[in-house]
Every structure is written in C-alpha cells, then in structure tokens.
Amino acid sequence: MKPATPYRIVAVISGPEPHRTILDDLLTEALQRIDGQHVLVRGRPHDPNTVRLGGLTCVPHLPGVELAEHMRNAELIVSRSGYTTLMDLVALGRSALIIPTPGQAEQEYLGTLHEGTGRFLVQRQDNIDLGAALIAASMLTKHARIEEHPHLERALDELGTLLG
C-alpha cells in the first residue's frame, strides 16, 4: 500500500442535516483560504464524486485505514465532537479542533468538557477560524497513541460472557 498523501488539514464531516451540509459549506470555504493541501471527508459514502478546489480535495468517504493514516499525518484534524469520534482520536493519540453540532446536547457537553483539557480545541459552528486553530494546535499537549491490549480485550470479553 502506498503512503497516504500528507494533508495539512484533515476535516471529517458528520451529523444530521441541515448541520452536516452547513459545516460542509463553511469548511469548504475556510479550507480554500488556508495554504497547503487539505482533505475534506464529506460523510456521504454513496456519493461517487471527488472534487478538487485548489489545494482542497473533497471526498465523499474514505475507508477507515486510509482515514486513520491521513489523520495520523495531518497538522490539524477537524471533526464533530461526538463520543465515538473523540474516542477514535484518543486511540490515534491525536488532538483535534472539534466543532459540536448545534442542538446536539451530548456534543455540546463534550465540547465544553474538553475545552480546557489540552487535548482538543473547540470552536462553535458559527465561529470557525482555521488559522487560529492551526496556531493553537501546535501548542496542544501531545498524547501517546493507545496501543491494542489483547489481554485486556480478552478479559473484557470473558467478563461480558460472565455477565451476559
């Protein structure tokens, strides 16, 4: 497998409409104003179209392994602040700019919770500043990638069997 193209910013969009499309439009515009090569993963797995806009490549979807490699190599990751997304970022040992989906109480809570941790930057959907995020991201605490722990996984499986 060839190595992934190193993108400066990897942005991953998810969430319910209309906020998914609103964020798509906001990030498409903002990413075109930032120097470098970027990728915007639009969260549309059934859309066959990849679009290039200058240094921005907009893709409908990426396989998990490819997305993880792009995220590991990016200067900045931009995503929603859903629980699963945050856990994926922690597992990769990566910080990110997180943008809670407006009206999604869990994401707004998680954004507030993580705002001061040194792991994530938080911006509101109506106030995105990628330039400021790039500067701030360079000062975030570096975290180790969480490695797989087969003994722990086996113990949890056994515990689940005993409880189930």
What spans do the regions from the language model cover?
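Structural motif corresponding to alpha-helix initiation and N-cap regions
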Residues: T21, H61-V65, Y83, E108, ...
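Anion (oxyanion) recognition and catalysis
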Residues: Q32, V90, E115-G116
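C-terminal amphipathic helix plus adjacent low-complexity
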Residues: G131-G164
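Donor-nucleotide binding loops and adjacent catalytic segments primarily
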Residues: M1-L76
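Nucleotide-sugar donor-binding patch of glycosyltransferase catalytic domains
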Residues: S95-L140
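Short amphipathic alpha-helical segments
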Residues: L23-D25, V51-L53, L89-L92, Y109-G111
